[in-house]
Every structure is written in C-alpha cells, then in structure tokens.
C-alpha cells in the first residue's frame, strides 16, 4: 500500500472527517439556512476565489486543473447566493498581477475563460434566473478570443436588470481608480465636466460597477486575510469574511456562515 504523507495525509484526514460528519453538517446547514433567511441578506456579495492552485498542488494536479475545479464551483455558489436573495455577485477571477504567470498556465486559463463565458451565454441556470453577466477590468489585455466570448455572454444577458454576475478579469482595484481618474481628467479637459462639481456620486459614474450598490460582504477563501487589490473603491464599509478552505472546496455551509456572521455585525459606517 502506498504510504500517504505530509500535506496529502492531512488532506485525506480532512476529507475523512468531512465524510463522517456529513449527516451532521446537513442538519446544521438546514438550521443555519433558516436563520439566514430570517435576517437581512446582503444585496451585493464580493468573492475572492482564492486557492485553486494550492488545491491542485495538494492533489498532484497541474495548476490549470485547479482553476477548472474553481470554475465549476462558481456556478454552484452563484445559485446558492441567488437562492438566499443576493442580487449581485462580483468574483475576482484574474488580477492584473496574475497576467505575469507562466505562459502555459495563462494559455490554459484563457482557454477556460473562453469556454466558460461561451457557456454562460447559453446557460439554462443563467437564463432561468435572469442573471446579467458582465466582465470588468482592463479587458483589452485579454486575448481577442476571450473578449469575443465575453461579449457573447454580455449580449445574451443584457436584458436582465435585477440580478448580476460580475466577473473581474485582468482587474486591479488601483488600476480601476486610475482608469476612472483618466476619464474624469479627459472630460474636464474637453469641457464636459466642471471640476468643482466632482464628488463621490460623480466618481461612481466612471468606475466599472458604479451602477450597483457597494458590496456589503466580501468573502475570501484559502485562509489569506487581505483584499489583494479587489474592489478598493467600493469596499470602504464592506464587511470582510475570511474562510480557511480553498475555493474549489467552498461549501454552502461556508456561505451560510459568512452571511450569518454579516447579519450579527453592527454596521456603523463610521458613525
């Protein structure tokens, strides 16, 4: 028999514990879901989908295979969010810094993005729930084939106005602010905008998802506890929740715990 050691042994033990506790978790999940539905659910949830590569590494897989597991998980999590009454979900799929990863990994990532955006355009789930799909970021940095797939998904869902899936790709929070400032500077220069009238409301018109409420809750998986340049303009008063599981292993009970914790917090907005 092959001996399992190190990281893999811990993973096997963790999986064994989860299997043995599955009936208990299911019961707890039902109770927790009832409590969550009794309280106020955030309208907009941001998710930093972290840990795909580490998940793959622990399974002895290639990094891109971890990203595929992560893409599968997104469909489930979106469905859970919508079932709970969340109106908008913004997920961090690819940062501007991620564009510096090895060429082979990026190629696989772009292949996956092209495939999944095309699938979103025709997804029964997306159209049944009437979810508008949008990509936000410096999209010009993506290959043409990926941009075409994005446009296909956006066109196919553009009539939907009540629920949103925003996918942040080639995205950086600082870069978004810089892009907004450049556009504002241009409009001031050509006389379209009076600089004395610029306020937060004005600025919102120039950021990527300024038409939506700020995310009330931001969840990050994998155990890392930082925003990593995600939604910087919007997150001034967001509640942050960090969970110590890799994104492909994120469960409905983890989402319920995050929202339940959100409901328990007192949001004072600096007052």
Curated annotation (Swiss-Prot):
Keywords: Magnesium, Metal-binding, Transferase
Top-rank taxon: Archaea
Reaction catalyzed: geranylgeranyl diphosphate + 7 isopentenyl diphosphate = tri-trans,hepta-cis-undecaprenyl diphosphate + 7 diphosphate
EC numbers for this chain: 2.5.1.89
GO biological-process terms attached to the record: polyprenol biosynthetic process
Binding-site residues, substrate: 51-55, 67, 95-97, 101, 220, 226-228
Gene Ontology molecular functions: ditrans,polycis-polyprenyl diphosphate synthase [(2E,6E)-farnesyl diphosphate specific] activity; magnesium ion binding
Cofactor binding note of this UniProt entry: Binds 2 magnesium ions per subunit.
Function of the molecule: Catalyzes the sequential condensation of isopentenyl diphosphate (IPP) with geranylgeranyl diphosphate (GGPP) to yield (2Z,6Z,10Z,14Z,18Z,22Z,26Z,30E,34E,38E)-undecaprenyl diphosphate (tritrans,heptacis-UPP). It is probably the precursor of glycosyl carrier lipids.
Subunit structure: Homodimer.
PANTHER family per the UniProt record, alphabetical: DEHYDRODOLICHYL DIPHOSPHATE SYNTHASE COMPLEX SUBUNIT DHDDS, DEHYDRODOLICHYL DIPHOSPHATE SYNTHASE FAMILY MEMBER
Family statement: Belongs to the UPP synthase family.
Protein name listed in UniProt: Tritrans,polycis-undecaprenyl-diphosphate synthase (geranylgeranyl-diphosphate specific)
Gene from which this protein is expressed: uppS
């Amino acid at each position: 028999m092959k001996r399992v050691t190190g990281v893999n042994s811990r993973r096997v033990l963790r999986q064994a514990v989860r299997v043995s506790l599955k009936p208990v978790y299911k019961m707890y999940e039902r109770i927790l879901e009832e409590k969550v539905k009794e309280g106020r659910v955030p309208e907009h949830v941001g998710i930093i989908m972290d840990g795909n590569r580490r998940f793959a590494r622990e399974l002895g897989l290639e990094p891109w295979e971890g990203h595929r597991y992560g893409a599968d998980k997104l469909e489930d999590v979106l469905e859970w969010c919508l079932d709970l009454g969340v109106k908008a979900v913004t997920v961090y799929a690819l940062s501007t810094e991620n564009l510096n990863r090895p060429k082979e990994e990026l190629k696989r990532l772009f292949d996956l993005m092209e495939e999944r955006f095309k699938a979103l355009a025709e997804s029964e789930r997306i159209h049944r729930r009437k979810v508008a799909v949008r990509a936000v970021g410096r999209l010009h940095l993506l290959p043409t084939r990926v941009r075409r797939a994005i446009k296909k998904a956006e066109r196919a869902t553009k009539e939907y106005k009540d629920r949103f899936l925003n996918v942040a790709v080639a995205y950086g929070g600082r870069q978004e602010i810089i892009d907004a400032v450049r556009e504002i500077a241009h409009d001031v220069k050509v006389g379209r905008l009076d600089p004395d009238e610029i306020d937060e409301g004005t600025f919102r018109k120039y950021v990527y998802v300024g038409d939506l409420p700020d995310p009330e809750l931001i969840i990050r998986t994998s155990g890392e506890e930082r925003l990593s340049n995600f939604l910087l303009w919007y997150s001034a008063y967001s509640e942050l929740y960090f969970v110590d599981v890799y994104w492909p292993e994120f469960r409905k009970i983890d989402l319920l715990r995050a929202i339940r914790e959100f409901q328990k917090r007192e949001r004072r907005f600096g007052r």
